[in-house]
Design a protein with these regions (language model features):
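Terminal helix/beta-alpha structural elements that buttress the NAD(P)+-binding lobe
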Residues: 1-191
């Protein structure tokens, strides 16, 4: 299960799961569900649960998607705003969950659950060799087309567009997109 599958990290985790032929994949997403839909294979049981319907509906949707099976693995690309609690309600007591926000205490899980936290900073220390191999694999994925970056959008006005971009992110008017600000498009830049 991938919670936050339309986020950048969630989308990348989803693509790696698909490439590894892991199915069924239960995803949780919202307004950007159409982005997630591009990667999943419903014929293999993959599905999307819409978090905008509320926590109770998410938990119910997860249980329905499991159809009596145990949820043994979860990747929480959100790690806040109810995702932790929702996962705790459906994850098997012998399961494992990985979070992406370090330094938090994740409560509500039995001691038998394997709780881990991962982030890209891990490859700068003891996992340098893994980071090198992994980045090469993702580069190959981009070249071969099985791995795709988040959609990008150039915000007009260069650095003058940063406030508008941040406002859009804060207000939730944009999702599943990465903003690009071209410094050279900033009025007065280079003069």
């Amino acid at each position: 299960m991938i919670y936050g599958a339309s986020s950048a990290v969630g989308s990348y985790a989803l693509q790696l799961a698909v490439k590894s032929n892991i199915h069924p994949i239960i995803t949780v997403a919202g307004r950007a569900s159409s982005h997630v839909e591009k990667f999943i294979d419903r014929s293999k049981g993959d599905t999307i649960i819409d978090y905008r319907n509320g926590d109770e509906a998410v938990v119910k949707g997860l249980k329905e998607a499991l159809n009596g099976a145990k949820l043994m693995h979860a990747f929480d690309a959100v790690s806040e705003k109810g995702s932790v609690e929702n996962i705790a309600q459906v994850l098997d007591s012998q399961g494992a969950v990985t979070f992406v926000l370090p330094g938090k205490e994740y409560k509500g899980f039995p001691e038998s659950v394997n709780l881990t936290c991962t982030n890209v900073g891990d490859v700068h220390n003891s996992l340098k060799d893994f980071g090198y191999v992994h980045s090469r694999s993702l580069t190959r994925g981009l070249e071969e087309g099985w791995f795709k970056a988040q959609p990008q959008e150039v915000v007009p006005g260069g650095l003058e567009g940063v406030a508008k971009g941040l406002s859009n992110l804060k207000d939730g008017t944009v999702s599943a997109v990465k903003y690009i600000f071209k410094v050279e498009d900033t009025p007065g830049a280079g003069q």
